[in-house]
């Protein structure tokens, strides 16, 4: 087997650039979580920062606990969407393959 260290370093650098780009895309994304059929919405960034909360006026006369539950559900919905849109382990395997690195399928990465 012929081992070319410079080629491996180039491939690793390419993969690192792709991962950095994916991380920047995640940080720049915004998702909207909702609950109560859209009566409560939460806009969240890929860094899990809540940018806005919108509550339909029809809920303003509701019980405080109901409103709190709807807000919590909307935040949880937004968190789930950020996680679904984040760079997953399978995306890292694809980046590695694009860089010419064949990772074993059993390797999972703990970061997103």
From Swiss-Prot:
PANTHER family per record: NUCLEOID-ASSOCIATED PROTEIN YBAB (PTHR33449:SF1)
Single GO cellular component term: cytosol
Task of the protein: Binds to DNA and alters its conformation. May be involved in regulation of gene expression, nucleoid organization and DNA protection.
Family: Belongs to the YbaB/EbfC family.
Taxonomic lineage: Bacteria, Pseudomonadati, Pseudomonadota, Gammaproteobacteria, Thiotrichales
Protein name as annotated: Nucleoid-associated protein FTN_1196
Assembly information from the UniProt record: Homodimer.
Signal peptide location: none
Keyword flag Cytoplasm: yes
Biased composition (Basic and acidic residues): 17-27
Keywords: Cytoplasm, DNA-binding
Keyword Cytoplasm: yes
Domain of life: Bacteria
InterPro entries: YbaB-like_sf (IPR036894), YbaB/EbfC (IPR004401)
Region called Disordered, residue ranges: 1-27
Matches recorded under SUPFAM superfamilies: YbaB-like
